[in-house]
Amino acid sequence: MITVIIPTYQPGAYLWKCLDSLESQTMEKHLYEVIIILNGCRNPYYEDIIRHIGKYSMNVRVEQTDVPGVSNARNMGLDISQGEQVCFVDDDDWVSEEYLQQLYSSVQDTGFISVSNVAAIDETSGETRPDYLSSVYQSLHHHKTIGLLKARRLLSSSCCKMIPKEIIGKDRFNVRLSRGEDALFMAQISSRVKGVALADTKAVYFRLLRTGSASRSDKSLKRACGDFLLQEYSFLKVYLSDIRHYNHVFFWGRFLAVFKGTIIKYLCH
């Protein structure tokens, strides 16, 4: 079985589009379950979700926690999941009809994570925009499988993937991080990853690009520095916890990526 985990906080109509895309999967309904984790405020969202999912034939359930945060919600989903494979989907994103089937079919061996194509959709215009993950996938998808180092650029996000539960093990998302929690989680589990399988292009993860901007102020600079230090410390702590089994080049690449990402985000705001 495959478990799809969707964390959501005060959801809008976009959640219905996400759920509709999972109901429309070509994969047989008994082969996957969908777990919605409503985090933060319960009302009126919980009852709205219950009413909406009543029309579906897929196996879907909703759980609620008063503790806000995507990491805590994902961890809660992992703890109650029944599937041998796990997919994370953000509540404002959606997937193609063959998403689950193609991801599942692409796995040739145990210890492999399967990765899908990605399409970034502009929230305002509805147009497809250039996307980092999409460009990396397009440059590599002619390979059936690739090694950890070659796949490192794809492993900055936990979405657009199918991850075996045996690879995840007891690892969970770091609830202290407000940025970079995906990349840290993928780095944590990397010691058990033999390689990455590239799914057929029919497996597409549609990522909604939301509009918005932040002011470039002393406060934002302090926040950026704080986030940077916490991320680097978290990566270093994970790396040192099992230094013999982690790939050194992979982790040092992550340290550099955090630094580079912090500089770019600050300069762009």
Predicted regions and their residues:
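Cell-envelope/extracellular polymer assembly enzymes that use nucleotide-activated donors
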Residues: 1-3, 21, 33, 184
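Short aromatic/hydrophobic "clamp" motif used to bind/position activated sugar donors
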Residues: 86
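Conserved nucleotide-sugar donor-binding catalytic segment
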Residues: 143-220
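Flexible acidic/His/Gly-enriched loops in nucleotide-sugar-dependent glycosyltransferase catalytic domains
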Residues: 57-58, 96-167
